[in-house]
């Protein structure tokens, strides 16, 4: 207490857990607690103090008291290091329903404060959190920076509130007002300020850093941001769907107690913007969340979760030791049907999950749902008291947006192979796994009829067929076509990847004009009969300009046999002349299917054969998607190549009647009959083969000296001199080298040019020896 007469300040701190009798002997009370009494004489014996001296006196008293409290150990350990940082955590979206919607839930543990798109990237706060065992906050400022003008939108108010326990709860807008909160008007910047008294931990103000420890000691408080009222555009009088605020944290994190846990910096935080979610459960069983196994969240959970050998408390199935926080920020949160009694948990917008070992028969990944982080650590899933009624059961999953955060890492030390930070960029030639989202139907296709395909390789008079290939003798006529809305590129080990470069050797041609680029190719060869094989090819193309294709079209149908219980898949004999429009910048999946006679082919097959009426086709990996139009927004998965399989380039030749040149041959490349006869005879002479080898080596060495890679130069040389000599009527080797050196087009164009000239020469000579 403070005495007014002598200006003495007395501070008494008693940290004994219980009261003690005054009659108890002093020896019996030792070690049971300590009472700290500090008396400070702040009286100035001189003249009366002015305002400045009073402030200095108060500062002196405060320093003395703090020093004595630290000596007695009642204020916790001294900070070893403090880090001031500003973190930008994402955006606050608009309200789409008019009800209370959660937009963000920010956990303040330093290893969890990450951007929702940051993956495993980390900053100085996360790095320090992985090196020290305890943390606390000196202060915290939550800054909302407006992304729209005050007059641009209306109808919505934003509320920032402090959740001191970081536990999901069923809270209404009025309940949020009972917390410490700040209401923000859209269009104005705001700062939500918190003091140390709002952020103190259970250990003299400190929190534990390791998230594997008790939840009440590690998570710290959390910041929740909600919106109320539908967001409308003032200018258009329509619903506004953009972002309202940019969220940032400004704070000073203090750390003490060095204890390195390197893997804490690798905790993942990301967003899955389109995922189908369902919940299941019955009386007495755990609540389970299902997501597709190809979704971004499922892949990340499988990659970063470590499965334990212990069994679940109620389900009997093994679950992971890794806990994930899931935040549903989409409008569909209220549409998710959940078994009782945890409807409030899902509609509240965020919960915790752990991956269940194995996958469901439907191909989905399953997760146990937990109402709190402590329950997840203790492996106590939410138990249902009943199932979903028939009237409310969903026929289709709800598509929503999930923000997910990896909460813990069972193994905290650094393994033999450190985790790779950031996103890897694929090298050319890699194989990829691609998940494609189907777009709208391309006319003349309709949802209630079979898929139209280009049937013939010979178009109507005055029109050209669309061909995809790499030169005049190696191409396929486009048959099937499908609009693709979006693509997700994955590496062979299911890591996210950037879009690979185009395949420079390939293109889509209408006549002699290149209309589209090719980004991947894949071919499937399936045995048809003992001496036949069905070859189906797919290509992903992107038009560089708008173009139309007019050709004879038909569709597949099931033909029933009277003596058999099977229905054969055949192409309709009747054809209709139709026009299909391809739009610039859109993705299209195009296909070609052919029945090949003979032994099993090796390498890539360029058989430009039309769909025949008598042939029976199989619904293979490609045709299964082109018999009937797939639903819009459905997913299609393929494993593809993003470069030409170079070892297969000339493995399969075409018959004369299957070849259709895109360009007229140059007059300089025409050879006389005598020259062709001479070339045919020379193929039987071994000395001429040696000359051909010499010319080939000359071309290769010249290209290498001019900067082209050895592999590419060899590829061009082998194609220009396939063990035959050029006719005397062709251009000389030096002329070809000069053209390759001076031309501005790429190596793929040079290669095609050389191959076309050589092939035209061979066609005029002895074609049988060319191959």
From Swiss-Prot:
Name one matching Pfam family: Astro_capsid_N
Site feature location: Cleavage: 313-314, 393-394, 423-424, 657-658
Specify where the region named P2 globular domain lies, as residue ranges.
424-648
Compositional bias of kind Basic residues: 19-35
Sorted alphabetically, the Gene Ontology BP terms of this entry are: clathrin-dependent endocytosis of virus by host cell
Task: Name the source's superkingdom.
Answer: Viruses
Which residue intervals make up region (Acidic)? 649-771
GO terms under cellular component: host extracellular space; T=3 icosahedral viral capsid
The entry's keywords:
Capsid protein, Clathrin-mediated endocytosis of virus by host, T=3 icosahedral capsid protein, Viral penetration into host cytoplasm, Virion, Virus endocytosis by host, Virus entry into host cell
- Outline the segment boundaries, as ranges, of region: Core attachment: 394-423
Query: Which segment of the chain is annotated as a signal peptide?
Result: none
UniProt feature, compositional bias: Acidic residues? 654-692
Annotated region (Disordered), positions in chain: 1-59, 653-694
Location of region: Basic:
1-70
Query: Per the record, which residues fall in region Inner core?
Result: 71-263
**Family the entry assigns:** Belongs to the astroviridae capsid polyprotein family.
- Report the protein name in the record: Capsid polyprotein VP90
This protein's species is: Human astrovirus-4
């Amino acid at each position: 207490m403070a005495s007014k007469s002598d200006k003495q300040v007395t501070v008494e701190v008693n940290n004994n857990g219980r009261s003690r009798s005054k009659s108890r002997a002093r020896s019996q009370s030792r070690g049971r607690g300590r009472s700290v009494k500090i008396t400070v004489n702040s009286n100035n014996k001189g003249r009366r103090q002015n305002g400045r001296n009073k402030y200095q006196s108060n500062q002196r008293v405060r320093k003395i008291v703090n020093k004595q409290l630290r000596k007695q150990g009642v204020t916790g350990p001294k900070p070893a290091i403090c880090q001031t940082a500003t973190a930008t955590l994402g955006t606050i979206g608009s309200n789409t329903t008019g009800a209370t919607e959660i937009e963000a839930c920010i956990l303040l543990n330093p290893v969890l404060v990450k951007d929702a798109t940051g993956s495993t990237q980390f900053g100085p706060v996360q790095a320090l959190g992985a090196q020290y065992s305890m943390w606390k906050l000196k202060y915290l400022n939550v800054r909302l920076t407006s992304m729209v003008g005050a007059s641009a939108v209306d109808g919505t108010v934003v509320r920032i509130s402090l959740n001191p326990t970081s536990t999901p709860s069923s809270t209404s807008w009025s309940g949020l007002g009972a917390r410490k909160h700040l209401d923000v008007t859209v269009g104005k910047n705001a700062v939500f300020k918190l003091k140390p008294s709002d952020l103190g931990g259970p250990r003299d103000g400190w929190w534990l850093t390791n998230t594997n420890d008790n939840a009440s000691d590690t998570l710290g408080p959390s910041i929740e941001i909600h919106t109320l009222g539908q967001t409308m555009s003032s200018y258009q009088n329509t619903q506004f769907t953009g972002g309202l605020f940019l969220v940032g944290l400004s704070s000073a994190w203090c750390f003490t107690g060095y204890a390195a846990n390197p893997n804490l910096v690798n905790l993942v935080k990301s967003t899955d913007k389109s995922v189908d979610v369902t919940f299941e459960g019955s009386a007495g069983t755990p609540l389970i969340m299902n997501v597709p196994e190809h979704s971004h969240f499922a892949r990340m959970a499988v990659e970063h979760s470590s499965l334990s050998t212990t069994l679940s408390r109620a389900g009997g199935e093994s679950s992971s030791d890794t806990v994930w926080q899931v935040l549903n920020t989409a409008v569909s949160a209220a549409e998710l049907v959940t078994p009782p009694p945890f409807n409030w948990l899902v509609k509240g917008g965020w919960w915790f999950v752990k991956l269940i070992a194995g996958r469901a028969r439907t191909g989905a990944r399953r997760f146990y749902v937990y109402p709190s982080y402590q329950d997840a650590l203790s492996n106590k899933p939410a138990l249902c008291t009943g199932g979903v009624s028939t009237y409310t059961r969903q026929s289709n999953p709800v598509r929503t947006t999930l923000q997910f955060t990896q909460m813990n890492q069972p193994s905290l030390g650094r393994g033999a192979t450190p985790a790779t930070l950031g996103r890897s960029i694929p090298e050319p030639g890699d194989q990829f796994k691609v998940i494609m989202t189907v777009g709208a139907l391309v006319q003349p296709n309709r949802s209630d009829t079979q898929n139209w395909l280009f049937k013939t390789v010979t178009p109507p008079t005055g029109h050209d067929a669309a061909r995809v290939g790499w030169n005049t003798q190696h191409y396929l006529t486009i048959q099937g076509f499908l609009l693709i809305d979006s693509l997700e590129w994955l590496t062979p080990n299911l890591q996210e990847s950037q879009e690979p470069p185009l395949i420079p050797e390939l293109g889509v041609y209408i006549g002699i004009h290149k209309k589209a680029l090719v980004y991947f190719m894949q071919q499937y060869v399936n045995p048809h009969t003992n001496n036949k094989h069905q070859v189906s090819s797919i290509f992903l193309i992107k038009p560089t300009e708008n173009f139309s294709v007019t050709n004879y079209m038909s569709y597949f149908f099931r033909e029933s046999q009277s003596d058999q219980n099977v229905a054969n898949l055949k192409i309709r004999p009747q054809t209709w002349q139709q026009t299909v429009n391809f739009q610039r910048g859109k993705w299209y999946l195009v296909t070609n299917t052919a029945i090949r006679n003979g032994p099993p082919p090796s390498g890539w097959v360029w058989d430009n054969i039309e769909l025949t009426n008598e042939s029976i086709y199989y619904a293979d990996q490609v045709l299964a998607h082109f018999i009937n139009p797939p639903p819009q927004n459905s997913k299609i998965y393929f494993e593809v190549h993003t470069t030409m399989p170079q070892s297969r380039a000339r493995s399969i030749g075409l018959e004369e009647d299957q070849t259709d040149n895109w360009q007229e041959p140059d007059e300089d490349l025409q050879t006389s009959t005598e020259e062709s006869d001479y070339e045919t005879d020379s193929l039987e002479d071994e000395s001429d083969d040696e000359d051909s080898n010499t010319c080939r080596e000359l071309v290769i060495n010249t290209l290498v000296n001019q900067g082209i890679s050895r592999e590419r130069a060899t590829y061009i040389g082998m194609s220009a001199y396939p063990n035959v000599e050029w006719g005397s009527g062709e251009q000389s080797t030096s002329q070809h080298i000069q053209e390759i050196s001076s031309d501005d087009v790429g190596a793929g164009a040079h290669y095609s040019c050389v191959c076309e000239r050589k092939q035209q020469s061979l066609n005029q000579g002895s074609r049988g020896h060319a191959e």
